[in-house]
UniProtKB/Swiss-Prot annotation:
Annotated region described as Disordered, given as residue ranges: 73-169
Protein's name according to its UniProt entry: Uncharacterized protein 011L
Extent of Low complexity compositional bias: 96-109
Biased composition range(s): Polar residues: 111-120
């Protein structure tokens, strides 16, 4: 077990409670009346609160007539408005970025002047409840007779509303139990290690008894890099103000919180289990890359219930279009911290399952025709969703004990994939590599949240195909398969369009918010991995139903966009047909045809084709489907290039230096096909809805869904925004740059 990490010191939260005003301060002792004067206590209290407020970038007004003698000082929390976001100083920006900002501002002005292109960026907020009247009363804790203390207290706070402050903490008042005030925090801190800073996810629950007794806390920390839970103590670990705190509404009556004691007594480690290297050497194949059992168990797991908020009820008042059977946790914002915590619980389930029976390692299969039904039997409510091609099958199931819905994608491993994996070359199968490594990293590092989070990757080395042979008997040939256990999102893009009604005032704004999330996800994989071939079928886009309200901040190309949250988080799934063209992350040895360079102009960007020497080439890679490239020796248009880039010595030398890893400067033609497929797929359901008649959205769909004759004829000089999604966003959404925001849910950065 690794040692407890040391985190940046921060301050405790300042909270004004109903009935009794308390300020949590661990380790404080009651001052003696005979040794300390009331005036001195007031001065000490003022200095202490000012230090806390300065650390949090806010100032709290302290209202105390005389100092109390107990260890908790009565204060009134005063929220100060957030400092408005200011973009980078224009003097420090490159000329191209500064010019682009000016052009963006001009497009925003033009957009606002047109009655067709206007839309609002203000999302629907939850309806505020009437505030409870403020009353004066004497606090429950009474001082000794030596000092006469009088404090002004307030009545219990009203039902939950969004809190706009910089503390990163959001509280709610349990109307079912008026004697308890809860404070829940989800967020990200930074682990202090040698080298770059590392994000650490945490969740903290604080229980404030109304009688003024000591608050009780429970914390859990998770390190996504080392993939393990971290021990933490209230005397050692303190929380930074979280940038991704999520608001929690009133929980159901069955909510039970597990308090954490002031001093954690770490139990002795369990005796070592008689497991041969976590089951890897107990079988003839190496599967440690696919069964993630590399994190140690934290002593907190035995004391803290990770599922502290069992979700049994959904408030139907958040949105008139809420579908009760869609998502269990529809009242939360679906932040990265919350999703990572849920993913860790699922991974822990499979880890313990394999540890209990080491023979299951390498024999976890979902195929009903296989004798190895260990994975199928370990889940509940298994339902076949659909089959994709002949090698991929999707299931929906429930993980027992934690009651978490998951999706299982079973993918048959080809002989070449298994040969590389079996030879201990360290090359995982393609689907495991893309889903379990690349896409998970994008979500956990707060680059892009709009991808499906994969919980675990399991392999079956001895399963049989379900199909029967030509003789009518079941084919008994051996095969191997991988099983990816991921998040399950039942709501599809078609379901989303079916829920939007003509009476919804924000119908067009919802469409634009969803479209932005899809484009940002495409821009992320284009830049990071050079990925093409997305949106293969209708199940490639899912939607997670969350509570509406607030904004997401997305930063791309140096511009920060404020995207309103209307209660829909877009999730991209099914990457079975994608190809990575960036050499650092390539899934094949083919790096795409690079024929033009993106060059900034005075107020935009353009394509500048470059030339290469022509030579026909025959591909031999079976993954790219062997074929002969037989183009005409003389291209029909001047400046057109026809070239293929490979790892071997047969590369055609271009006329300009080409960085194959720079997918934004030297894109591939498949990027344009992805943009066309996105808008065509988007318009498939959009046209069947009443809002398909909106002129602005109609023009967007018509412009970007039509492919030009590309790339065999020409690279259009003004077609940059129809190839690269990051420039598509910049062209469509100038109004959302540096927009005013009331509540920021999370911030994501692609730069």
């Amino acid at each position: 077990m690794m040692e407890s990490p040391k985190y940046k010191k921060s301050t405790c939260s300042v909270t004004n409670l109903g009935g009794t005003c308390i300020l949590p301060q661990k380790g404080a002792t009651a001052p003696k009346a005979k040794d300390v004067s009331p005036e001195l206590l007031v001065n000490k209290m003022d200095n202490l609160c000012q230090d806390w407020a300065r650390t949090r970038n806010e100032y709290n007004k302290v209202h105390i007539e005389q100092a109390p003698t107990d260890s908790y000082f009565g204060v009134v929390h005063s929220h100060t408005p957030k400092k408005k976001y200011t973009s980078r100083d224009s003097d420090s920006e490159p000329e191209a970025t500064s010019t682009r900002r000016s052009a963006t501002a001009q497009r925003a002005a033009n957009l606002k002047s047109s009655p067709v292109d206007q839309w609002s960026t203000t999302p629907p907020q939850p309806q505020p409840q009437p505030a409870a009247p403020t009353v004066k009363k004497t606090c429950a804790s009474s001082p000794p007779a030596a000092l006469s203390v009088k404090r002004t207290c307030t009545s219990p706070p009203p039902p939950p509303v969004l809190i706009d402050d910089d503390t990163g903490e959001d509280a709610f008042y349990d109307t079912n139990d008026p004697d308890i005030f809860y404070d829940i925090e989800n967020g990200v801190s930074e682990l202090e290690t040698e080298g770059p800073k590392r994000p650490v996810y945490y969740q903290r629950n604080i229980r404030y008894p109304i009688d003024g007794s000591v608050p009780q806390e429970s914390e859990q920390w998770y390190d996504p890099i080392d993939d393990e839970f971290l021990a933490s103590s209230g005397d050692v670990v303190s929380l930074e103000p979280s940038p991704i705190a999520a608001f929690q509404p009133t929980p159901p009556k069955t909510v039970q919180f597990v308090p954490m004691p002031e001093e954690i007594i770490v139990p002795p480690p369990p005796p070592p289990k008689t497991v041969v290297d976590e089951g890897v050497q107990a079988m003839p194949y190496t599967v440690d890359q696919m069964i993630q059992t590399d994190f140690e168990e934290s002593p907190l797991l035995a004391n803290v219930n990770l599922r502290t908020i069992p979700i049994e009820e959904v408030n139907p008042n958040f949105s008139p279009v809420l579908m009760q059977d869609m998502v269990r946790d529809s009242f939360v914002f679906g932040t990265v911290a919350q999703r990572v915590m849920a993913s860790q619980r699922v991974k822990q389930f499979f880890k313990e399952l394999i540890e209990q029976d080491v023979s299951l390692a390498g024999r976890m299969c979902m195929d009903s025709g296989s004798p190895q039904l260990n994975l199928y039997n370990s889940l509940m409510g298994v339902k076949l969703l659909y089959r994709w091609r002949s090698s991929t099958t999707f299931y929906r199931a429930i993980v027992p004990e934690i009651d978490e819905p998951v999706q299982v994608m079973q993918d048959v491993l080809s002989s070449s994939e298994w040969a590389k994996f079996d030879s201990q070359a360290g090359i995982p199968p393609k689907m495991v590599y893309i889903h379990y490594k690349l896409l998970n990293d994008l979500v956990k590092t707060l680059i892009c949240p709009n991808f499906q989070l994969t919980h675990a990757a399991l392999v079956c080395v001895d399963c049989r195909p379900e199909a029967v042979g030509s003789d009518g008997l079941q084919d008994g040939r051996q095969r191997r398969c991988s099983n990816l256990v991921s998040e399950y999102h039942e709501m599809t893009l078609e379901d989303l369009f079916n829920t939007i009604k003509p009476a919804d005032l924000n119908a067009k704004n919802i469409i634009l918010s969803v479209l932005f999330q899809m484009l940002y996800a495409v821009a992320t994989v284009q830049k990071q991995f050079g990925m093409g071939g997305l949106f293969a079928n209708a199940d490639s886009v899912h939607v997670r139903r969350i509570q509406p309200g607030g904004f997401w901040h997305y930063t791309v190309n140096g511009l920060r966009y404020s995207v309103p949250n209307y209660g829909y988080l877009v999730i991209l799934t099914n990457f079975t047909d994608v190809v990575n063209y960036r050499p650092d992350f390539a899934t094949t040895r083919y790096f795409g045809r690079r024929q033009a360079k993106v060059v900034p102009t005075r107020n935009w960007y353009k394509f500048v084709p470059f030339t290469t020497r022509y030579r026909p080439f025959v591909t031999v890679d079976p993954i790219t489907q062997a074929k002969t490239t037989a183009y005409a020796p003389n291209p029909p248009t001047e400046g057109i290039t026809i070239n293929e880039f490979y790892k071997d010595s047969s590369d055609l030398r271009p006329s300009v230096p080409v960085d194959l890893n720079d997918m934004i400067t030297f894109p591939v033609p498949e990027f344009h096909l992805t943009i066309c497929r996105l808008f065509s797929f988007f318009s498939k359901f959009y046209d069947s809805n009443f809002i398909g008649n909106d002129p602005f959205v109609r023009n967007l769909v018509d412009r970007y869904s039509q492919p030009f004759e590309f790339p065999d004829v020409y690279w259009p000089e003004d077609g940059v925004s129809r190839v690269l999604a990051c420039y598509t966003i910049e062209e469509i959404y100038p109004n959302w740059v540096d927009g005013d925001t009331d509540y920021v849910i999370e911030s994501y950065n692609l730069d």
